[in-house]
């Protein structure tokens, strides 16, 4: 218990305290608190520390035989005692992050209605579109500073999960707290229930969402607009993170609101920021610069194109022209290499399509130019996978890349693990241990010729908690492209491999607090420089970061009245 902080004064007592996860301490209530708050007999006699509670909880966690059961167990602790939950997760971050988020959260989303136990967050359904203000006022969280919102249409690589997508905002906000020190009292997960086009859910008698095909067009746009306006009225200074919206909606929503409200899309911008940060670290480890790379993407959706645009921006900042940078980035999707004469390119794909004149001298390529064709003709030094289709980085492709690049940089980023384009084990064996690898999901270390390679997880959790902390600490009114670029550079500065030539490409999760604070400072500093917040010195910004960083410690309670 942190006795150095002033006590919290509570106006209620008895079972109500034990039912409030933000303030419940379970067996850690002191003797005085048990008397004053009418808790005697409601908890066992022994008074425990939070570490003793966490030790018991960890033993119980280890007793479960599969990851989904472990996920459900941890969520139950979160819904009864949030301070204990975050102490347990922080004590075992490497072991538990894959359980509370990817890859296990995908299965939890698929089984959300079947495994539903207790309410968390808000479900705003389309039939209630005229009562959004009332629904927001129903939240048990009154000082919301960060919202993660989804409509459940593109959950990881699993597609439309309807309200089951709520597992993603819950998981993401758990990482904001456990990695970025954001108080759970300031977080709110929201699912916009606009129906589902998943026939299995519509026919499932246990499905708990609105049984209706997804709305679209003007109805959808008006619903999103009503939601954004209502949130801004209720919590005008909150940061809104868009999560797992379908490709057709993700970019238009971001473009519509990024200059009106403090918001960002983690799938597009967060993924891009962590990918660029990892790429900068890999380039430094390989002894080269990003603007010298030739980059091939497999996957040209909003996430892939978001990464590509961030790479182009970083290349330009390193001194080459925008036009030149775009010639060094090739986007391949299911129809092959994106070319400027293709009739059905999406708006965000058009600027990344290669000019047909650029491939006139290519040799031995098919009608739909494949990834192998791109590798053989452009000789890329970087290969990034965001396709969501497993096994597409074949041995032939990887060996062809390695034949012209001594230290290829290969990032199979698709989630969950079952969707990865190639496993690190295969990539490292096909390149004799020379590839610099980062993945979107966690993988065990790989041994090649007696050397052990730790696999960096190019996970957004290295970026978005620091961005959120930086926005809160600085009071930024928007999330600018420059702030995101600063987060990438700050992450690269934390790379063990880039710093001393050994260790993993990205920091260990055990160092995530220091990484998040470093990123928060870089993000907040740019916000100050761009006039997106009030002027403040570096010293004041750093103090604000430390002051906003929450730790899972119990507080002393006093009763306001009897």
UniProtKB/Swiss-Prot annotation:
User: Cofactor note from UniProt?
Assistant: Divalent metal cations. Prefers magnesium or manganese.
The record ties this protein, via PROSITE patterns, to: MALIC_ENZYMES (PS00331)
* Superkingdom to which the source organism belongs: Bacteria
The enzyme's first-digit EC class, named in words, is oxidoreductase
Q: Record-annotated residues binding a divalent metal cation?
A: 243-244, 267
* CDD domains tied to this protein: NAD_bind_1_malic_enz
- EC numbers, comma separated: 1.1.1.38
Positions binding NAD(+) in this chain are 154, 267, 415
Q: Which SMART domains match?
A: malic, Malic_M
A single MF term (Gene Ontology):
NAD binding
Query: What family does the Swiss-Prot or TrEMBL record give for this protein?
Result: Belongs to the malic enzymes family.
- Protein name per its UniProtKB record: NAD-dependent malic enzyme
């Amino acid at each position: 218990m942190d006795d150095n902080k002033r006590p919290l004064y509570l106006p209620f007592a008895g079972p109500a305290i034990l039912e409030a996860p933000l303030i419940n301490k379970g067996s850690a209530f002191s003797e005085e608190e048990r008397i004053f708050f009418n808790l005697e007999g409601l908890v066992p006699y022994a008074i425990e520390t939070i570490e003793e509670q966490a030790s018991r909880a960890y033993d119980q966690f280890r007793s479960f035989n599969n990851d989904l059961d472990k996920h459900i167990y941890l969520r139950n602790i979160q819904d009864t005692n949030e301070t204990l939950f975050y102490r347990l997760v922080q004590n075992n971050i490497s072991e538990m992050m894959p359980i509370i988020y990817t890859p296990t959260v995908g299965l939890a989303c698929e089984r959300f209605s079947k495994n539903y136990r207790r309410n968390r967050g808000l479900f705003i359904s389309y039939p209630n579109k005229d009562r959004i203000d009332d629904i927001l006022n129903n939240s048990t969280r009154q000082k919301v500073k960060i919202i993660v919102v989804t409509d459940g249409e593109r959950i990881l690589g699993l597609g439309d999960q309807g309200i089951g997508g709520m597992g993603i905002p819950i998981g993401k906000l758990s990482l904001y707290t456990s990695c970025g020190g954001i108080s759970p009292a300031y977080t709110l997960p929201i699912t916009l229930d606009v129906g589902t086009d998943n026939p299995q859910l519509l026919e499932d008698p246990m499905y708990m969402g609105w049984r209706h095909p997804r709305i679209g067009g003007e109805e959808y746009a008006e619903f999103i607009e009503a939601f954004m306006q209502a949130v801004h009225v209720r919590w005008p200074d909150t940061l809104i993170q868009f999560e797992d919206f379908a490709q057709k909606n993700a970019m238009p929503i971001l473009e519509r609101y990024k200059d009106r409200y403090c918001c960002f899309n983690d799938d597009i911008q967060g993924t891009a920021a962590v990918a660029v940060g990892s790429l900068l670290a890999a380039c430094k480890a390989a002894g080269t610069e990003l603007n010298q790379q030739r980059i091939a993407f497999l996957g040209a959706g909003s996430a892939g194109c978001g990464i590509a645009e961030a790479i182009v921006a970083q290349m330009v900042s390193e001194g080459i022209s925008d036009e030149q940078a775009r010639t060094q980035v090739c986007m391949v999707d299911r129809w092959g290499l994106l070319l400027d004469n293709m009739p059905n390119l999406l708006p965000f794909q058009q600027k990344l399509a290669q000019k047909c004149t650029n491939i006139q001298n290519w040799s031995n390529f098919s009608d739909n130019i494949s990834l192998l064709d791109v590798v053989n003709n452009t000789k890329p030094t970087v290969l990034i996978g965001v396709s969501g289709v497993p096994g597409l980085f074949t041995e032939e492709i990887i060996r062809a890349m390695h034949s012209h690049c001594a230290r290829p940089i290969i990032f199979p980023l698709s989630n969950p693990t079952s969707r990865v384009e190639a496993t690190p084990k295969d990539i490292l064996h096909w390149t004799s241990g020379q590839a610099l690898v980062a993945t979107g999901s966690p993988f065990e270390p790989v041994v090649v010729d007696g050397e052990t390679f730790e696999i960096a997880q190019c996970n957004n959790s290295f970026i978005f908690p620091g961005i959120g902390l930086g926005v809160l600490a600085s009071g930024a009114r928007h999330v600018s492209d420059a702030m995101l670029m600063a987060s990438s550079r700050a992450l690269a500065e934390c790379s063990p491999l880039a710093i001393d030539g050994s260790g993993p490409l990205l920091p260990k999760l055990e160092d995530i607090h220091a990484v998040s604070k470093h990123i928060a400072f870089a993000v907040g500093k740019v916000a100050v420089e761009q006039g997106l917040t009030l002027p403040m010195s570096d010293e004041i910004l750093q103090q604000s970061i430390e002051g906003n960083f929450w730790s899972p410690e119990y507080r002393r309670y006093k009763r306001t009245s009897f």
